Amino acid sequence: MPINIPNGLPAASVLAGEQIFVMTEERATHQDIRPLTLLFLNLMPKKIATEIQYMRKLSNTPLQVNIDLLRVDKHISKNTPQPHLDTFYKDFEEIEGRNYDGMIITGAPLDQIDFSDVTYWDKLEKIITWSKEHVTSTLFSCWGVAAGLKIFYDLPLINRKEKLSGVFLHHTAQSLNPLIRGFDDTFLAPHSRFIDFPSDVIRKHTDLEILADSEITGMFLAATPDRRQVFVTGHPEYDATTLSDEYRRDLAAGKDPKLPENYFPHDDPTQIPSCVWRSHASLLFGNWLNYYVYQITPYKW
C-alpha cells in the first residue's frame, strides 16, 4: 500500500523514481479505508535527506500512511531551504489539539551537549510530554532516544569516549514481542553516535523491554510494556552511503574521525559500501506500524 505525502514534497519524485508507491493527496481522499496519520518530528540538519530515508521505510507496508512534518522551532536552517520548511512543516501550535496514530522523533547532532544547553529543550520536552496523551505509539531514534529517556525516566546523558560509528551485529531477544516478529537471531544495523546506552543501566532504571542489543552497541531496540514508546538507538533508516558521507564530512572539518567499523569493503574508504541492514530495517518499521500503531490505535479518536 502507498504512503501519502504532501503534493510537491521532494521525496515524492525521488521515491516515485525508485518505483515506490506514492499516493497523491487528491487520490488518497477517495480511499474508503482509514489511513494512519503519523507526525514526523525532524531534528536532523539535512531534513530533506532524512525525510526520504524514513519515508522509504514507512512506504513498504500494506498500510496507507499520511505524514505531517513537524519542526521544533522556526530558526533559520543552514542545511535546508527555508521555503521547504515554510511549505511543508507545521509548528507545534498548529497540531497541539490533534491526535496521531504514530510519531517519529529523529536523532540530532547534539550528542555532546547537555540537555539544558539545547536551545529548544523546553519546547521538545513539551512535545514529548504531549505525545503521551495524543499519540498511540512514538518511535524515538538515536539522540531522540536519549531525550525520551531523560524526560520519561530522568536518565542522564551517558557519553562514550569515542564515537560509535559503523555497522554492528545485534542479538534479538528471546521474546514474543511482535516488534521483532520475523527477525533473525542476529542482524546488522548502523550506528553513529557518541551517546552510550548500556543495557544493564536501561534494565536497572527503566521498565523497558530490551528487544535487541549487543556488547558493543549496548541497547539497540526497546519498548515500553504498553507499546506506547519505542526506542531505536541506531540508524536503520540510513542509506548505504550515509556513514561514508558523515565520515568524509568530518574529515573535511578536520576532526580526524575513525573509519566506520565493519563498513567499507576491506576497510578501504575508496570502495563503495553495501547496505546489509535494509531487510531488517523494513521489517522493524513494518512491525511498528502494524502491531504498535494500526492494531492499537482507535478508529476514531
From Swiss-Prot:
<comment type="similarity">
    <text>Belongs to the MetA family.</text>
</comment>
<dbReference type="InterPro" id="IPR005697">
    <property type="entry name" value="HST_MetA"/>
</dbReference>
<dbReference type="InterPro" id="IPR033752">
    <property type="entry name" value="MetA_family"/>
</dbReference>
<keyword id="KW-0808">Transferase</keyword>
<keyword id="KW-0486">Methionine biosynthesis</keyword>
<keyword id="KW-0012">Acyltransferase</keyword>
<keyword id="KW-0028">Amino-acid biosynthesis</keyword>
<feature type="active site">
    <location>
        <position position="237"/>
    </location>
</feature>
<dbReference type="GO" id="GO:0004414">
    <property type="term" value="F:homoserine O-acetyltransferase activity"/>
</dbReference>
<feature type="binding site">
    <location>
        <position position="163"/>
    </location>
    <ligand>
        <name>substrate</name>
    </ligand>
</feature>
<dbReference type="GO" id="GO:0008899">
    <property type="term" value="F:homoserine O-succinyltransferase activity"/>
</dbReference>
<dbReference type="GO" id="GO:0005737">
    <property type="term" value="C:cytoplasm"/>
</dbReference>
<dbReference type="GO" id="GO:0019281">
    <property type="term" value="P:L-methionine biosynthetic process from homoserine via O-succinyl-L-homoserine and cystathionine"/>
</dbReference>
<feature type="active site" description="Proton acceptor">
    <location>
        <position position="235"/>
    </location>
</feature>
<feature type="active site" description="Acyl-thioester intermediate">
    <location>
        <position position="142"/>
    </location>
</feature>
<dbReference type="InterPro" id="IPR029062">
    <property type="entry name" value="Class_I_gatase-like"/>
</dbReference>
<keyword id="KW-0963">Cytoplasm</keyword>
<comment type="function">
    <text>Transfers an acetyl group from acetyl-CoA to L-homoserine, forming acetyl-L-homoserine.</text>
</comment>
<feature type="binding site">
    <location>
        <position position="249"/>
    </location>
    <ligand>
        <name>substrate</name>
    </ligand>
</feature>
<dbReference type="Pfam" id="PF04204">
    <property type="entry name" value="HTS"/>
</dbReference>
<feature type="site" description="Important for acyl-CoA specificity">
    <location>
        <position position="111"/>
    </location>
</feature>
<feature type="binding site">
    <location>
        <position position="192"/>
    </location>
    <ligand>
        <name>substrate</name>
    </ligand>
</feature>
<protein>
    <recommendedName>
        <fullName>Homoserine O-acetyltransferase</fullName>
        <ecNumber>2.3.1.31</ecNumber>
    </recommendedName>
</protein>
<comment type="pathway">
    <text>Amino-acid biosynthesis; L-methionine biosynthesis via de novo pathway; O-acetyl-L-homoserine from L-homoserine: step 1/1.</text>
</comment>
<feature type="site" description="Important for substrate specificity">
    <location>
        <position position="192"/>
    </location>
</feature>
